[in-house]
Amino acid sequence: MLNIGPFSFHSRLLLGTGKFPDFDVQQKAIDVSEAEILTFAVRRMDIFDAKQPNLLEKLDVKKYTLLPNTAGAKNAEEAVRIAKLAKASGLCDMIKVEVIGDDRTLLPDPVETLKASEMLLEEGFIVLPYTSDDVVLARKLQELGVHAIMPGASPIGSGLGIVNPLNLSFIIEQATVPVIVDAGIGSPADAAFAMELGADGVLLNTAVSGAKDPIKMAQAMKLSIEAGRLGFEAGRIARKRCATASSPLEGMSVVE
């Protein structure tokens, strides 16, 4: 089970809802992924105007936990305003804090992310900050009392996969809250690798919505995350420089 604050989930796949070709493909991809948490940018939909088409009117929202994010925020104050807007609409009190500090790489601003997380915790939100693979920043966020850490595998939408597995492993090893790898996942192999490192979950969007067949890719991501988690729990064999025979040699007769 994936436990975030007071919530428990069977699926360890968190799915973003942007960039799908149409609502039908989006719905089918969500269904086959079996994701229980769906994330979306509050700024990209008018959640108060029923006349405007959006994700929420097409989905049976009772089946999912919605994770609004603060994408578009440039500082802590903007992030808090967006989070409060989502809460006022009656959505889940869980919020993904996203404060971008660089427009080229879309990497998060560490100072503003810390500040926004602290402010939102004081407001009673369940806080999941998107961060880089900075080990120290992850620890500081954890010390604030956030409910999960969401380090990026690589820049948002890049599909580069996990570019710094060592730092991710350090973050996971020191974590006392769930670690959900977020951003940069490009393939099922990337998702499986994140889980094999010991991540508690994976959040992705473009890898599915931008695939040639989003529905098949959603299923592939589901299976790879399950396989990666099983592999982590099973425990891989140690790496060795020399070969070790898989069949025992003792008791074997030698034909001369």
Curated annotation (Swiss-Prot):
PANTHER family: THIAZOLE SYNTHASE. It catalyses: [ThiS sulfur-carrier protein]-C-terminal-Gly-aminoethanethioate + 2-iminoacetate + 1-deoxy-D-xylulose 5-phosphate = [ThiS sulfur-carrier protein]-C-terminal Gly-Gly + 2-[(2R,5Z)-2-carboxy-4-methylthiazol-5(2H)-ylidene]ethyl phosphate + 2 H2O + H(+). GO terms for cellular component: cytoplasm. The gene is thiG. InterPro entries: Aldolase_TIM, Thiazole_synthase_ThiG, ThiG. It is an enzyme of class 2 (transferase). GO terms for biological process: thiamine diphosphate biosynthetic process. Coiled coil: none annotated. GO terms for molecular function: thiazole synthase activity. Pathway: Cofactor biosynthesis; thiamine diphosphate biosynthesis. Keywords: Cytoplasm, Schiff base, Thiamine biosynthesis, Transferase. This is Thiazole synthase. Its EC number is 2.8.1.10. Belongs to the ThiG family. The active site is at K96 (schiff-base intermediate with dxp). Pfam families: ThiG (PF05690). The keyword Endoplasmic reticulum does not apply. Catalyzes the rearrangement of 1-deoxy-D-xylulose 5-phosphate (DXP) to produce the thiazole phosphate moiety of thiamine. Sulfur is provided by the thiocarboxylate moiety of the carrier protein ThiS. In vitro, sulfur can be provided by H(2)S. 1-deoxy-D-xylulose 5-phosphate binds at G157, A183, G184, N205, T206. Its main location: cytoplasm. It is found in: Cytoplasm. Homotetramer. Forms heterodimers with either ThiH or ThiS.
